[in-house]
């Protein structure tokens, strides 16, 4: 690996780790209704499993309700089944092609569980970042051993890798702090 590409490659890997964290945090329920909450729902449609968003329009008319407007009337029962199978802890009311999902308020205990889960996701992401950093440092050691870079360059590039890791680690902290605030706000 070339020393010039190393930082860029590490940055891309760290960016992916942050994206994964973002997707995991989207799945955590806050007290508010959000269509992102249904991202994990898949529906049996025309012989294959597809995301819910491909067979229905999703909207939040208020802070406590998600509406699922199914486009094809024959798909309503499949959508209901998909929502049930996703095990989101939601009940639904069907009115023709419209499925309403009332979002119950979270108890204090449940909010704390979600905060713990958010912190767990954050810690897993930080572990990924540290592993990416370790791989980068090992690559630098290999470049130094092969006399592609000198010791001063190795130390300089190692510091850059550490700064990059610190930068992404602080992004994880702020994402977790923001999600914790969302969850704990009643």
Curated annotation (Swiss-Prot):
Subcellular location: Cytoplasm
Biological processes, Gene Ontology terms: cytoplasmic translational termination
Keyword entries, A-Z: Cytoplasm, Protein biosynthesis
GO cellular component: cytosol
A Gene Ontology molecular function term of the record: ribosomal large subunit binding
InterPro entries (UniProt xref): Ribosome_recyc_fac (IPR002661), Ribosome_recyc_fac_dom (IPR023584), RRF_sf (IPR036191)
Disulphide-bridged cysteine pairs: none
CDD domains: RRF
Record-linked Pfam families: RRF (PF01765)
Protein family according to the UniProt entry: Belongs to the RRF family.
Function per UniProt: Responsible for the release of ribosomes from messenger RNA at the termination of protein biosynthesis. May increase the efficiency of translation by recycling ribosomes from one round of translation to another.
PANTHER family per record: MITOCHONDRIAL RIBOSOME RECYCLING FACTOR PSEUDO 1, RIBOSOME RECYCLING FACTOR
Protein name: Ribosome-recycling factor
Species assigned in the record: Rickettsia typhi (strain ATCC VR-144 / Wilmington)
Gene for this chain: frr
């Amino acid at each position: 690996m070339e020393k010039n590409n190393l930082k860029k490659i590490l940055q891309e890997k760290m960016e992916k780790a942050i994206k994964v964290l973002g997707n995991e945090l989207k799945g955590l329920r806050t007290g508010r209704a959000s269509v992102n909450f249904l991202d994990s729902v898949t529906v049996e449609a025309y012989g294959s499993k597809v995301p819910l968003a491909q067979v229905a329009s999703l909207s939040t008319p208020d802070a406590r309700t998600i509406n699922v407007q199914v486009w094809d009337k024959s798909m309503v029962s499949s959508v209901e089944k998909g929502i049930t199978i996703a095990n989101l802890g939601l009940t639904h009311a069907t009115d023709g092609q419209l499925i309403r999902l009332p979002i119950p308020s979270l108890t204090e205990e449940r909010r704390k569980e979600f905060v713990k889960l958010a912190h767990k996701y954050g810690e897993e992401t930080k572990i990924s970042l540290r592993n990416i950093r370790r791989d980068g440092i090992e690559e630098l050691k290999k470049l130094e051993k092969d006399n592609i870079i000198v010791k001063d360059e190795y130390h300089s590039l190692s510091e850059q890798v550490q700064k990059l890791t610190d930068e992404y680690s602080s992004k994880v902290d702020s994402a977790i702090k923001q999600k914790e605030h969302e969850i704990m706000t009643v």
